[in-house]
């Protein structure tokens, strides 16, 4: 796992990160895109300029730092012409845990072999919030979840890979939220405003313990604030009105979603008030409950490539570098004031 710690203006962060990426050029960085996709990426660039403007300065710094084409980085980071991970995320408020601290949990579902490419990034852009976020492969702008110094934690799960047109992708929206917002309501407001690309389920919790589930789609976005102090998102929409927007969902994905929902609901009802990080780890390690899976293909094994647990009131992350059934969760310090 790579640990990246950078601060400064967005451009300076990009420049320093770009210099770190020079050695990756012999490994195929940046990936090649067709002229058509490079041209199409400009529409996504315009949307990010509108809603997350500083991040483009970071990309420009990266392009200069590693001497690669800026538009190739735009196509790689801002568009849907890329990897398609699914995920599982759940959150529990403080009153239902034994320690009295809220917990936020994520399984990143992609190729298990990609676990070696996990990167955690502690960044502090000038005038913004410091954050601790997770990405992989080549660590550029993207964050697939994380937590910031205000105690706001966010992640998400893709509900539909249908490309509905230029907008702000999950990985970019998550980064911008970590950089800028302190409360769940602020993050929700931002997600409501942005044009969506894929269908995404976001889950958010802040330091006050406010959980929001945001089922987001270009045609409609539905926000739920669970009264029970627990919620989860996974590989499809939960609400019937949002499911109508994904009419071609496979029976296998629907069944997995329902299995996960039923298991987590029963587990929460049984354990609430006594939940600990270890009790979460215990269920994450079990294959039969379908919180993770192993699907062997010619390309590799699809499943969980890493898992992590954070708390809005803690400066520690527990991370499993690989499928949790085969790997231990180890503690890592979250240091927002790094030198």
Feature names for model-found ranges:
Residues 175-179:
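Short, well-ordered beta-strand elements within core beta-sheets of diverse protein domains
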Residues 1-87, 182-193, 207-211, 233-339:
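C-terminus-biased signal that marks the final domain/tail of proteins
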Residues 138-144, 150, 161, 184-193, ...:
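Structured soluble/peripheral alpha/beta segments that form catalytic or ligand/cofactor-binding pockets
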Residues 13, 28, 32-33, 50-171, ...:
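A contiguous strand-loop segment
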Residues 106-108, 137, 157-158, 207, ...:
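Fold-independent oxyanion-binding glycine-rich loops
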Residues 110-112, 160-162, 218-221, 323-327:
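Short, surface-exposed beta-strand-loop junctions and turns on beta-sheet-rich folds
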Residues 93-100, 148-150, 205-209, 216-219, ...:
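Short acidic-glycine loop/turn motifs at beta-strand connectors
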Residues 107, 148, 201, 232-240:
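Asparagine-centered polar/low-complexity signal
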